[in-house]
Amino acid sequence: MLPLLPKNFLIILLAAMNKINYQKILDGIIEENSKNGVVPKLLLHACCAPCSSYCLEYLSNFFEITVFYFNPNISIKEEYEYRLLEEKRLISLMEFKNPVTIIDGEYNPNEFYSAVKGLENESEGGKRCEKCFRLRLDVSAKEAKKLGCDYFATTLTISPLKNSQLINTIGEEIGQKYGVKWLFSDFKKKEGYKRSIILSKKYELYRQNYCGCIFSKKAVEKNIAE
């Protein structure tokens, strides 16, 4: 009898086997829309202002953007609120070719804890992070559909510490589930991450040293102590 495979096995396998150039796919989407004179509506899930900086500078040339700040993984309420304020401040300071607005989702950390129950001791970048991606992208897709957006995407792919192959695989799957197009991305390409550091300095943004959840915070604190 063959052993039962974990539910996420296929996604992990596809992400590992198919090193897709998601930036190239995004370039193609942008080129096609530009040829047709179309400025689509995009819901952009934002994890924080520093990661958003380059994504907004880049995407606002081609999309009308609604930034969706939904991050129940941020365990400390004060941290959540400060990051939200920084996101709003950044948007108020930047200049955009097309309109950029922001809405914030419901803050309920218990939603995150419920999603990752049993995975508390997983290492960073493992199954717990996958559950977190799913939670945030699922709610983002539903919000995008409610608002009538053409696409939804996330700033998460800009981080060198995040698996863009996995995030895009999950995003595409969720997009198909709700009937909203997933905008493929790998924002760390074209030196996007380096550009985000430059923009963060320009706008004097708060740059946290952990992703947001209490588990990532403890991992960073442990590494510093060692």
Q: How should these model regions be labeled?
A:
Residues 9-226:
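Nucleotide-activated chemistry modules centered on ATP-dependent adenylation/adenylyltransferase
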